[in-house]
Amino acid sequence: PAGIGWARTPKLFMKPGEQKNFCIVDAAMNDLPRPAMYQAYHAIVPLEAAGAQQEPQVYDVVGPICESGDWLGRERSLAVAAGDLLAVLSTGAYCSSMGSTYNTRPRPAELLVDGAAAHLIRARESVSDIYRSERLVPTKA
């Protein structure tokens, strides 16, 4: 079910602005397209306490793809610091089935957590994996 999964993403950097602040993370619209496609809401929370020392600020949480639709959450109040990990919640049925390799971004690994044990159930793709089945058309002499 969707409610039991979550996506972990490192925060790449912050981009303060006059009208908006952006929290740029490694996850992108190719990993979780629901927010970009139909403004689906996914809670986003810090996984580490480093940012807890900071006052919460309002951010748009966006990915690194240069697309206007590459966002995971808008106007989120977060206390985050450089290097924090964030969790995008309720993604269980969505990341795996809806994710893509858009912009040659490999799909992330998937883990199954069973109590204190975590099991790798799908390895992270590489760029080589993406291109493996493609074939070039021979050029004419």
Label each PLM-derived region with a short phrase.
Residues P1-A141:
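Charged (often Lys/Glu-rich) extended helix/loop segments that serve as interaction or gating elements
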